[in-house]
Amino acid sequence: MKYYLVRLLAPRATFMQDMTAAERTMMQEHSAYWRSWMAKGNVVVFGPVADPAWPLGIGVIRMDDDVDPAVMWKDDPVMRPGTGFRIEVLPMLTAVVAGS
């Protein structure tokens, strides 16, 4: 099993204050999408972070060793062309997991 830190960077610094109705709907779809992966056991935790420099969300995901983590966001609503979101994925060198 491999673990990854995922950072989702918003399209603009003011996103949390001025998202449009369409963007708000997209974020609700994004949350539901990640919850579906959580139900499968691939998402450990996810959510928005109060970073004054730039709005972002983080998640910790786990994938079988032979699975490319990109499979998770290929259908994520926020990763559709034109949304302006960027994703950064960092493999964790080791992971200490509750209950292990």
Task: Tell what function each PLM region has.
Residues 1-100:
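Conserved, structured core segments of small domains
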